[in-house]
């Protein structure tokens, strides 16, 4: 109606920090919280699969979950791993959406 396009960027629980690191008894999320090394392995494998097929790797992160020292070290290691692949771009979600609009 207004000439604007809606673009939905795919997300997946597997690439969200919340299911891995939330401990919230009031929400019936009692853990166990995963070890950052386990999460690294999952996220690295998912990146490699998405890279192989030329797809976007979209992490969903919340500062209150990913923002712990050990988790940030894991995230830094993951970023270095991703940067080791040729032709990888780190792009804002809005810029990816504009590519498809």
What are these regions (language model features)?
Residues 1-53:
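Active-site-adjacent pocket scaffolds in enzyme catalytic domains
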Residues 33, 37-101:
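C-terminal domain-boundary segment and adjacent tail
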């Amino acid at each position: 109606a207004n000439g604007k396009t809606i673009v939905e960027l795919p997300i997946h629980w597997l690439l969200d920090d919340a299911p891995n690191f939330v401990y919230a008894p009031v929400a019936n999320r009692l853990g166990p919280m995963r070890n950052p090394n386990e999460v690294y392995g999952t996220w690295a494998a998912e990146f490699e699969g998405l890279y192989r097929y030329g797809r976007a790797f979209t992490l969903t992160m919340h500062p209150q979950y990913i923002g712990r020292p050990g988790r940030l070290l894991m995230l830094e290691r993951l970023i270095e791993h991703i940067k080791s692949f040729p032709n990888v771009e780190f792009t804002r979600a809005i810029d990816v959406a504009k590519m498809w609009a």
